[in-house]
Amino acid sequence: MEAIISFAGIGINYKKLQSKLQHNFGRLLKALTVTARALPGQPKHIAIRQETAFTLQGEYIYFPILLRKQFEMFNMVYTAHPVSLRALPCVETEFPLFNYQQEMVDKIHKKLLSPYGRFYLHLNTGLGKTRIAISIIQKLLYPTLVIVPTKAIQIQWIDELTLLLPHLRVAAYNNAACKKKDMTSKEYDVIVGIINTLRKKPEQFFEPFGLVVLDEAHELHSPENYKIFWKIQLSRILGLSATPLDRPDGMDKIIIHHLGQPQRTVSPTTTFSGYVREIEYQGHPDFVSPVCINEKVSAIATIDKLLQDPSRIQLVVNEAKRLYSLHTAEPHKWGTDEPYGIIIFVEFRKLLEIFYQALSKEFKDVQIIVPEVALLCGGVSNTALSQAHSASIILLTYGYGRRGISFKHMTSIIMATPRRNNMEQILGRITRQGSDEKKVRIVVDIKDTLSPLSSQVYDRHRIYKKKGYPIFKCSASYQQPYSSNEVLIWDPYNESCLACTTTPPSPSKQKHT
């Protein structure tokens, strides 16, 4: 049987393959279809999403090249689209890697040497996925396209590439660059582009790239972003992710058909001291009742209602003041000679401005950066992102901040709204590889005791215990938005511990895994 290999993958005549497989044809297509799991509170009128690891183009059905072994029994005769790749300049440049990074570089390099090589790297947040990928770029010496989800991550890639591989011509590909001229791999050795822009490019744009790096690869499951896979099949592909199979709806499984099963590395031994301050908050009755849609609790609408409580907003401000006061008044006590940085996470963009206004009234002389707010106006500025690296307080949504944004001076988190998913990535914002291990990490977690979302705290407890962070409980209410003294409810070294304390705990050492 004849087949073609092109940008879109392995193309086989639809009718001939159907005739060859007969009743197994339907089974094959079913096996290559991922159906989303229904989420709690999801309205019934919203259709259950499906995505397929095949696509139809005219008389042909295309499959990911990774699946070509499944067709070996048919003695396939392939006609491949010709690809001519130039070699990047070979300059001996060395930069340090940890042992676990070097081991993974060797493993990835071996896999990507072969044409159409694929590798899906699973490495926890803050452990240097970018540096591993840059080492692969240096070894393969192919023109490379790096695809990232946000401008903030794009800037980080540009900075890291320029620092580690200064001899290469590196460029950022975005809407502004598109208007000036059409960048190609002939002009640049490495192009770093944002998915929202690159997914609109024709197949021919991707032809000159011998290597494509997909940062935050698990996020390419969305209907629009997923289309990129049917344009890059001729390249070697390296996918990077801290949470490759972590979506509640399971749609990130579709990525496996293109990249293979995620491969983990040996855990490093970086340690961080830290603890959790859990505040049990009793909100005003007007704001804690659940919001139901189609007789099911809607988490989004319920969170929106919770944050209409002015006392709850004041509680977050008070906690920020408390952290800032501790860090600035007694930095030596907390293991540092300079103030900490504080990240405040919220669920929705519209809450960023609400908290910004509330914080600005209390922190008149403190730099507060909201790098995401500018996105509402068409794009975050380079200036705002640059300022964020020295800001004392940063406001982010969970969706934006959980991606690989690196602020190494940030060591405290306030979770201003409830959260269940992506907790590994959220905590990773304050446990970046290369940041100061001596600084104590602090997580402020607000549990809305009268809300149906309060049970989500137990999912967070599971992650805290995995990290080895003791949990200290205190209370507050809409009548008294100042948290009480702390009570130790869990200690990684003493499960039965229930000791009272009003001073910062002796933090545990967390192995960064």
Swiss-Prot record:
E.C. designation(s):
3.6.4.13
All residue ranges annotated as the Helicase ATP-binding domain in the record: 110-262
User: Does the record's keyword annotation contain Nucleotide-binding?
Assistant: yes
Per UniProt, the keywords (alphabetical) are:
ATP-binding, Helicase, Hydrolase, Late protein, Nucleotide-binding
Spell out the InterPro entries in the cross-references: Helicase/UvrB_N (IPR006935), Helicase_ATP-bd (IPR014001), Helicase_Restrict-Modif_Enz (IPR050742), P-loop_NTPase (IPR027417)
Output the Gene Ontology terms for molecular function.
ATP binding; ATP hydrolysis activity; DNA binding; RNA helicase activity
* Residues that bind ATP: 123-130
* Record-linked SUPFAM superfamilies: P-loop containing nucleoside triphosphate hydrolases
The recorded induction information for this protein reads: Expressed in the late phase of the viral replicative cycle.
Tell me where the sequence motif DEAH box sits in this chain: 215-218
For this protein, the record's Gene3D superfamilies field holds:
P-loop containing nucleotide triphosphate hydrolases (3.40.50.300)
The catalytic activity, as recorded, is: ATP + H2O = ADP + phosphate + H(+)
The family line of this record is: Belongs to the DEAD box helicase family. DEAH subfamily.
Q: What is this protein called?
A: Putative ATP-dependent RNA helicase QP509L
Name the source organism.
African swine fever virus (isolate Warthog/Namibia/Wart80/1980) (ASFV)
Q: Name the lineage.
A: Viruses, Varidnaviria, Bamfordvirae, Nucleocytoviricota, Pokkesviricetes
